[in-house]
């Protein structure tokens, strides 16, 4: 499926009052909605930069449904739900009834009947979360934890929170470079959408033509393409390195990993071309010596581990807001409490 065809109308994600009830994609959401997610996430981090625990989802059940392998995303969603005092169930998809021929629809209906309040879904098929929210379980809050090459909205929002907290600059004043496998990366797609919605006017995509998607110009007027790394990172405030998505590539996009590192690897010489206070980010997992040098990943400008902490806060925000949006939609509460 061409990604341009995966349009998610805002009314699927928002309730009648305009509040989040599902979180499926960045595209179609307003700056106000994204800012509310960021502000709510920030409220879950105290003055000592520690995550708080709150009873906002006490008595609610969050089910993690990961049809693709994950370490960080699944674990941080579990940590986020527990900090909201929710019950968390991690469904073993490999041993579920879907492996015995049961349809996805029937599996989800059975899980919904077990009093699930929120499904956190990762799936290899683009549009899976949209399908579940629209056609299967509209009264369960659906959080997209990554669907194929399409979207990874919570990763984008934790990246936006990291950028906001670390640079302390308005998005309108930032130059952001995204380096690597843009073609196969749902993170790149979601980050570009979030940056544009929040007002960033200088988004630089640095990649060989073989790692750029068809219809790249559809990403917007504020996105510029650079095939040469040195030109792209010059005077940047933020650099986001992406790994090559080998599991989604049918044929090799480059001759070797060594060739990619030579042309697009982030090393000390290239980082020196950016602004002195430039921050370095990576969604993980990292391939050291391919897209990023260890001296950069572990260096003073790296905020990679901060992204992980911010990820828990953002996922707390999305879980809380979408649950309350669902309750508001069903007339069970009048106003959002966070």
UniProtKB/Swiss-Prot annotation:
Q: Which InterPro entries match?
A: Asp/Orn_carbamoyltranf_P-bd (IPR006132), Asp/Orn_carbamoylTrfase (IPR006130), Asp/Orn_carbamoylTrfase_sf (IPR036901), Asp_carbamoyltransf (IPR002082), Asp_carbamoyltransf_Asp/Orn-bd (IPR006131)
Which GO terms of type biological process are on file?
Answer: 'de novo' pyrimidine nucleobase biosynthetic process; 'de novo' UMP biosynthetic process; amino acid metabolic process
PANTHER family in the record: ASPARTATE CARBAMOYLTRANSFERASE (PTHR45753:SF6), ORNITHINE CARBAMOYLTRANSFERASE, MITOCHONDRIAL (PTHR45753)
User: Could you tell me the keywords of this UniProt record?
Assistant: Pyrimidine biosynthesis, Transferase
The UniProt catalytic activity note for this protein reads: carbamoyl phosphate + L-aspartate = N-carbamoyl-L-aspartate + phosphate + H(+)
By its UniProt entry, which NCBIfam families does this protein fall under?
Answer: asp_carb_tr, PRK00856.1
The protein's matches in HAMAP family, at most eight in alphabetical order, are given as:
Asp_carb_tr (MF_00001)
Asked if Mitochondrion is a keyword of the record, the answer is no
Binding positions (L-aspartate): 100, 186, 243
Q: Where does carbamoyl phosphate bind?
A: 72-73, 122, 152, 155, 284-285
Keyword Transferase in the entry? The reply is yes
- Give the family this protein belongs to, as stated in its UniProt record: Belongs to the aspartate/ornithine carbamoyltransferase superfamily. ATCase family.
GO terms for cellular component: cytosol
| Enzyme Commission number(s) from the entry | 2.1.3.2
Q: Name one GO molecular function term.
A: aspartate carbamoyltransferase activity
How is the quaternary structure described? Heterododecamer (2C3:3R2) of six catalytic PyrB chains organized as two trimers (C3), and six regulatory PyrI chains organized as three dimers (R2).
Function noted in UniProt:
Catalyzes the condensation of carbamoyl phosphate and aspartate to form carbamoyl aspartate and inorganic phosphate, the committed step in the de novo pyrimidine nucleotide biosynthesis pathway.
This protein's name: Aspartate carbamoyltransferase catalytic subunit
Its annotated pathway reads: Pyrimidine metabolism; UMP biosynthesis via de novo pathway; (S)-dihydroorotate from bicarbonate: step 2/3
């Amino acid at each position: 499926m061409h990604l341009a065809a995966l349009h998610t109308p805002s009314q699927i994600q928002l309730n009648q009052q305009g509040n989040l009830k599902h979180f499926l994609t960045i595209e179609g959401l307003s700056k106000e909605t994204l800012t509310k997610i960021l502000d709510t996430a920030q409220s879950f981090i105290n003055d000592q930069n520690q995550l708080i625990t709150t009873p906002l989802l006490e008595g609610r059940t969050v089910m993690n449904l990961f049809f693709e392998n994950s370490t960080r995303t699944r674990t941080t969603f579990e940590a986020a739900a527990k900090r909201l005092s929710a019950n968390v169930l991690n469904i073993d998809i490999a041993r579920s009834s879907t492996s015995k021929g049961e349809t996805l629809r029937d599996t989800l209906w059975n899980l919904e009947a077990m009093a699930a309040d929120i499904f956190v879904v990762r799936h290899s098929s683009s549009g899976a979360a949209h399908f579940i929210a629209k056609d299967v379980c509209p009264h369960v809050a659906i959080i997209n934890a990554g669907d194929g090459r399409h979207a990874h909205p919570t990763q984008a929002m934790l990246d936006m929170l990291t950028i906001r907290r670390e640079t302390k600059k308005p998005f309108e004043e930032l130059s952001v470079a995204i380096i690597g496998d843009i073609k196969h990366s749902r993170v790149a797609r979601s980050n570009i959408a979030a940056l544009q919605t929040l007002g960033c006017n200088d988004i630089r995509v640095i990649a060989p033509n073989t790692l750029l998607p068809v219809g790249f110009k559809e990403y917007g007027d504020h996105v510029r393409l650079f095939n040469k790394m040195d030109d792209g990172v010059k005077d940047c405030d933020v650099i986001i390195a992406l790994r090559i998505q080998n599991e989604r590539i049918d044929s090799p996009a480059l001759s070797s990993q060594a060739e990619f590192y030579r042309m697009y690897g982030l090393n000390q010489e290239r980082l020196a071309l950016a602004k002195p206070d430039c921050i370095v980010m990576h969604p993980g997992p990292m391939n050291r010596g391919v897209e990023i040098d260890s001296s950069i990943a572990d260096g003073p400008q790296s905020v990679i581990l901060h992204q992980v902490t911010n990820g828990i806060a953002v996922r707390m925000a999305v879980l809380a807001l979408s649950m309350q949006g669902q309750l508001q939609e069903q007339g069970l509460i009048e106003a959002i409490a966070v």
